[in-house]
UniProtKB/Swiss-Prot annotation:
It comes from Hadronyche infensa (Fraser island funnel-web spider). Expressed by the venom gland. Residues 20-47 form a propeptide. Disulfide bonds join C54-C69, C61-C74, C68-C84, C93-C108, C100-C113, C107-C124. This is Pi-hexatoxin-Hi1c. Keywords: Disulfide bond, Ion channel impairing toxin, Proton-gated sodium channel impairing toxin, Repeat, Secreted, Signal, Toxin. It comes from the Eukaryota. Residues 1-19 form the signal peptide. The keyword Transport does not apply. Its main location: secreted. GO terms for cellular component: extracellular region. This toxin potently and selectively inhibits ASIC1a, an isoform of the gene ASIC1. It incompletely inhibits ASIC1a activation in a pH-independent and slowly reversible manner. This toxin acts by binding to and stabilizing the closed state of the channel, thereby impeding the transition into a conducting state. In vivo, this toxin protects the brain from neuronal injury when administered up to 8 hours after stroke onset. The keyword Repeat applies. It is found in: Secreted.
Length: 128
């Protein structure tokens, strides 16, 4: 795809610089048909690549605020970390005794993520 774009742009540039009358009809056809298709395909592919590189929910978006996946926005946590969160979610902090696994800094005020013994997930508990 990128080769087709490069060749099309090179042809257009050469035609503009040299103004070859013999190839004028060829250039008109290229501009009318192929070039439009080539650029449309390139834009579509670029969008697909961008969508594949989006940042998932609760993952860091530091330095990439506009790259959260669809339905998510970059939100700055209390402790300075930025993560992608659902746009419609109003309360981002985790309430008392809720799991804070992979969300260590998201406990509500007066709570902290408490590591429990054994193989249990950590929970938000009152600060000690």
């Amino acid at each position: 795809m990128k080769l087709r774009i490069t060749l099309a742009l090179t042809s257009v540039l050469a035609f503009c610089v040299f103004g070859d009358k013999e190839n004028e009809n060829l250039m008109e056809n290229l501009l009318e048909d192929d070039l439009l298709d080539i650029f449309t395909d390139a834009i579509h592919m670029e969008r697909q690549e961008t969508n594949q590189e989006c940042i998932a929910k609760w993952k860091s978006c530091a330095g990439r605020k506009l790259d959260c996946c669809e339905g998510l926005e970059c939100w700055k946590r209390r402790w300075g970390h930025e993560v992608c969160v659902p746009i419609t979610q109003k309360i981002f902090c985790l309430e008392k005794w809720k799991s804070c696994f992979e969300r260590k800094y998201d406990c509500c005020e007066e709570l902290e993520c408490w590591e429990r013994r054994g193989n249990k997930h950590p929970v938000c508990a009152p600060k000690q």
